[in-house]
Amino acid sequence: MTSNKLKFSYFQLTFGQEEAYLHPEKTYQRLKKYGYDAIEITPPKGRYGLGVKLEDYLETHRQLKSDFGLEVSCINECWGEEWDPFSPDYKTLTESKTADLAVSETKSSVDFAAEVGAPLVTVAVAIHEDIGKDRVKECTEVAVDALQRMADYAKSKNVNLVLEATNHLEMGKFINTVFNHKRLIKYTRRDNIGIQLDWFHANFEELNPYEAVMDAHPLLWHMHFRDSNSLTPGYGNVDFKAVLRAVKKIGYNGYCTIESAPMIPDSDTAARVGIEYLRILESIVDYQLSPEFPNGYALKM
């Protein structure tokens, strides 16, 4: 168990592409104002970027990091065209051709992470077609091979990968739970692949948020704090107090990245309320886990 204070980050892309790629300084100003430690960014690729060049984006964030004293918590690998299965650039982990595209795309994000000083790159477990019992072995083998290639390249750059556990409605039925993510990671036999829990997705798939954290340990390296309705924490029904009790008990030292889509009621409010809400919960949880709870004093001999 740890009493270390949580580290907070924000997923920049949810502020919209215009801000993320054309005016990223607005995000840094906002996060610095409200006491964030870091920013999570998505490199300009595919349908993301509004024409901004990757090299220019890298230099911009290097300068903004220095100017505002924020870290980059993670590079969120959105794979550009992953939401359009009819695109020739569609990328998945479960079919050989599309997995090759995913490996190539992830390698470029690993390069970006190494250059900007981010410790992690997110990999989403996208699938192309429905997977049933008759295809699960084949698809698992393709996914393991792709992840091994990604992980080996990432290791050469001193970067770790995190698999985001996603809900079956968005990414299909394959490995939607923490348990199955751990199983897939075990098959890879690589020590630089962990788990990213997104509480919007987990709310669909996990039986209990406390158990999900405990089950993910010690591979829980990154988290997205998005509520059950995809809004800033506090606007839905995810039991974030239970989440924080669990992360304190396992000694979690990764970032808590807040996310909201859409921004309700606006970007400033979403960023401010999200961190204020979680800090209040953290103070409650710290006391609940202290020896002075609930009487106001600890037993002594």
Each model region followed by its residue ranges:
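Short acidic/histidine-rich active-site segments
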Residues: T257-M263
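A structural motif
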Residues: Y36, A118, L220, Y252-N253
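Active-site groove signature of glycoside hydrolases
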Residues: A113-K133, V162-N167
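Substrate-binding cleft of secreted/luminal carbohydrate-active enzymes
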Residues: G254-T257, S290
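N-terminal pre-domain/capping segments
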Residues: M1-A118, K137-E138, Q148, K155, ...
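Structural detector of well-ordered beta-strand residues that form the stable sheet scaffold
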Residues: S9, S73, V121-T122, V162, ...
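Acidic/histidine-rich catalytic cores of soluble enzymes
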Residues: N4-L6, Y21, A38-I39, P44-K45, ...
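A short acidic, helix-capping loop that chelates divalent metal ions and anchors anionic groups
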Residues: R47-G49, W83-F86, E129-D134, L169-M171, ...
